[in-house]
UniProtKB/Swiss-Prot annotation:
InterPro entries: DisA/LigA_HHH (IPR041663), GIY-YIG_endonuc (IPR000305), GIY-YIG_endonuc_sf (IPR035901), GIY-YIG_UvrC_Cho (IPR047296), Hlx-hairpin-Hlx_DNA-bd_motif (IPR003583), RuvA_2-like (IPR010994), UVR_dom (IPR001943), UVR_dom_sf (IPR036876). Belongs to the UvrC family. The lineage of its organism: Bacteria, Pseudomonadati, Myxococcota, Myxococcia, Myxococcales. The keyword Phosphoprotein does not apply. HAMAP family: UvrC. Keywords: Cytoplasm, DNA damage, DNA excision, DNA repair, Excision nuclease, SOS response. SMART domains: GIYc (SM00465), HhH1 (SM00278). Residues 206-241 form the UVR domain. This is UvrABC system protein C. Interacts with UvrB in an incision complex. Residues 14-94 form the GIY-YIG domain. PROSITE patterns: GIY_YIG, UVR, UVRC. The UvrABC repair system catalyzes the recognition and processing of DNA lesions. UvrC both incises the 5' and 3' sides of the lesion. The N-terminal half is responsible for the 3' incision and the C-terminal half is responsible for the 5' incision.
Length: 707
């Protein structure tokens, strides 16, 4: 340890605060908090604490500087640590998934007919609204929302649609919604359905079951058989839900149980959420390179996790976290009620901690097995494509254009086989006019590689969505910039990026390479080589679907590599390519709508660029602007009664421009004369959303000639 660090250790104050450990490059690698900065930080370098020697040795190697921030209280230190971790994202701190990944259900009880909405947990909580969650996955929240809306018949339409609908939607016809948007539905009756749904979401099904039984019996006695049947269906749905839930505690309390399992620097924190004594959800949170003590890791985790999640009455933890009392005060303040952190040593609650620990161990095993499969898939990609190394950092690029208009490019990133959305990029093609996919791709790859050279970081592999022509355009861009696409024999450590082209499978006409799904006379299915399709037909098999295989084009090779069907390497590359395609089409659709929106609003006198953007942000679609009242338009930023009246009058004059409906119609628009011509802005504006989306999606409607 150098003299500067030793001096800082000697001068540490015995006060609460946070400390930032930095490496020799000045990057923050760990943030911690302490009730006494002197005691906590010096403990890392105390030779008498043998249980911490592994990470102390690591500190001796990495630590270059130390910074401390003194706070007025321990509670303030807890809050500051949370903010510092989010700001610096240190290597050795626990970091949860981005908070935009956490999803909750929101119920705005200020509305006379509220609905359940899916919201990001990071959104600011609104007064008068109730929140349920967070949910561990999008599928779980969709299933919950589907069940609640189906059996408790809450409306699903947005407030804007609710205010402007003139006739009921299909959900009313199939008895899934009472249509309060159109018909007079008693607010008290709807409120009863809302309260039933709230009890179900909060895990108080026992009370709900008793009340539903009483109301069902009352409806039957009053000869209201249709109402009784509806209540019976609700009761059966709730009882089925109860059968799936495991009762772990008889006291019907709300608590979270935290389990922790570690092997070396890797660990998993398991959260078992119990509501009304029943297990409601289970989430496993894996973390790498966690060299610091478990009590510090647990404290940071709880502070971060409950920032966007309502803490229950009790949180059972396997060991006492650092500054447990201050942490409990922070969680209680966030919740508005008391939250207790307990570490039971015996009894039923201690048994729950053991269950959580065993679940954490199981989650750890599953996590590492997933890592092994991912490593095998990356190695398989390297072998199949003759790459110099496993592609840990892959990117894929795609071009999206409608007859040469509004051309855009997309780039998606994948690191270690997982999406890396922080490095997703969108490109507006600037230097190419007309329908020239190769030139567009050359421009996009040039801009990407130029930025990579400036940052000093090249991906391992760039996948081009397309065939040999698209790959050659990308290779030309790399050559123009002097970017190596193969390792240098004389300097194996020199940076380089490899490029390949991935061509989609297509429908084929007649015998060709690849496989076909064939069906026999007795319904038996089998994979057959397309070259043997005629023989298969003679034997009584009929081709169900014939497609060419996915083909990967490599630099300097005439024939493409055909990847094995259903292989891990094909799945990984196709997933990357499809994500790039989705990202490009989404961006193209956004630009299209903005352009159509702007072109129509340009005809309204007195509406400048700022007000156009405000209308677009507020309403999102021209149809919604047309349906809005002058009072609703006046609520948009920058609009007063005069501007709102002008917009409303423009859309309701006798010669108002037609506004395409959101519903898809028509077929893909084609260009006359065989080849696609560049579309004018007017043509793009006139085409329906469905027509353009279908053209961009490239659904392979026409067969590919036989090879």
């Amino acid at each position: 340890m150098d003299a500067n660090l030793r001096r800082k250790l000697d001068e540490l104050p015995a006060e609460p605060g946070c400390y930032l450990m930095k490496d020799r490059a000045g990057e923050v690698v760990y943030v911690g908090k302490a009730s006494s900065l002197r005691s906590r930080v010096r403990s890392y370098f105390d030779p008498g604490r043998g249980d911490q020697r592994a990470f102390v040795a690591l500190l001796d190697e990495l630590l270059g500087d130390l910074e401390v921030i003194v706070t007025r209280s321990e509670k303030e230190a807890v809050l500051l640590e949370n903010e510092l971790i989010k700001k610096h994202r240190p290597r050795f701190n626990v970091r949860l998934r981005d908070d935009k990944d956490f999803i909750v259900l929101k119920l705005d009880e200020r509305h006379p007919y509220p609905r359940l909405e899916v919201r990001r947990a990071r959104e600011k909580r609104q007064p008068g609204a109730r929140y349920f969650g967070p949910y561990s996955s999008a599928s779980s929240i969709r299933e919950t929302l589907r069940m609640v809306n189906r059996h408790f018949q809450l409306r699903t339409c947005s407030d804007h649609v609710f205010d402007h609908r003139k006739r009921p939607c299909i959900l009313y016809q199939i008895h899934r919604c009472p249509a309060p948007c159109v018909y007079e539905v008693a607010a008290e009756e709807y409120r009863q359905s809302v309260e039933d749904a709230v009890e179900f979401l909060e895990g108080r099904e026992g009370e709900l079951v008793e009340r539903l039984r009483g109301r069902m019996a009352g409806a039957a006695e009053g000869l209201r058989f249709e109402e009784a049947a509806r209540l019976r269906d609700q009761l059966q749905a709730v009882e089925r839900s109860l059968e799936k839930q495991r009762v772990l505690m008889s006291d019907r309390g709300d608590r979270d149980v935290i389990g922790l399992y570690r092997e070396g620097p890797d660990l998993v924190v398991q959260v078992l959420s119990m509501r009304a004594g029943k297990l409601q959800d289970a989430q496993a949170h894996p973390f790498r390179e966690q060299e610091f003590p478990d009590e510090e890791i647990l404290s940071s985790f709880l502070s971060l996790y409950y920032e966007h999640t309502d803490a229950p009455d009790e949180i059972l933890v396997p060991l006492e976290p650092v500054q447990a009392e201050a942490l409990a005060d922070v969680l209680s303040e966030r919740r508005g009620r008391r939250v207790r952190l307990l570490t039971p040593q015996r009894g039923a609650k201690a048994d729950l901690l053991d269950v959580a620990r065993r679940n954490a161990e199981q989650g750890f095993r599953a996590w590492h097995e997933h890592d092994e499969r991912r490593e095998q898939a990356l190695a398989a990609v390297a072998r199949a494509l003759h790459l110099a190394r496993p592609p840990r950092w892959m990117e894929c690029y795609d071009i999206s254009t409608f007859q040469g208009a509004l051309a855009v490019g997309s780039g998606v990133s994948m690191k270690d086989g997982e999406p890396d959305k922080a490095n997703y990029r969108r490109y507006k093609v600037k230097a190419v006019a007309g329908q020239d996919d190769f030139a567009m791709l050359h421009e996009v790859i040039t801009r990407r590689l130029r930025r990579a050279l400036g940052e000093g970081q090249l991906p391992d592999l760039i996948v081009i969505d397309g065939g040999k022509g698209q790959l050659n355009a990308a290779l030309a861009a790399a050559k123009d910039l002097g970017v190596p696409t193969r390792p240098s024999p004389g300097n194996p450590d020199a940076p380089f990026v490899e490029l390949v082209g991935l061509a989609k499978s297509r429908l084929v006409d007649g015998p060709s390479l690849g496989t076909a799904r064939v069906v026999g006379r007795r319904g038996r299915r089998a994979e057959a080589r397309l070259a043997d399709a005629a023989e298969a037909a003679e034997k009584g098999f009929v081709s169900e679907l014939a497609r060419s295989p996915e083909r990967v084009f490599l630099p300097g090779r005439k024939d493409p590599v055909v990847l094995r069907q259903n292989s891990a390497e094909l799945f990984l590359l196709a997933r990357l390519r499809d994500e790039a395609h989705r990202f490009a089409i989404t961006f193209h659709r956004k630009l299209r709508r903005e352009r159509n929106f702007q072109s129509v609003l340009e005809e309204i006198p007195g509406i400048g660029e700022g007000r156009k953007r405000a209308l677009l942000r507020h309403f999102g679609a021209l149809r919604r602007v047309r349906e809005a009242t002058p009072e609703e338009i006046a609520q948009v930023e920058g609009f007063g009664p005069r501007q709102a009246a002008a917009v409303h009058a423009f859309f309701h004059r006798p010669d108002a421009p037609p506004i395409a409906a959101d519903e898809p119609s028509g077929a893909p628009a084609g260009a006359p004369g065989g080849g696609p011509a560049e579309a004018s802005p007017e043509a793009v504006a006139a085409a329906t959303e469905a027509e353009i989306d279908a053209a961009l999606a490239d659904e392979d409607a026409s067969p590919e000639p036989a090879a």
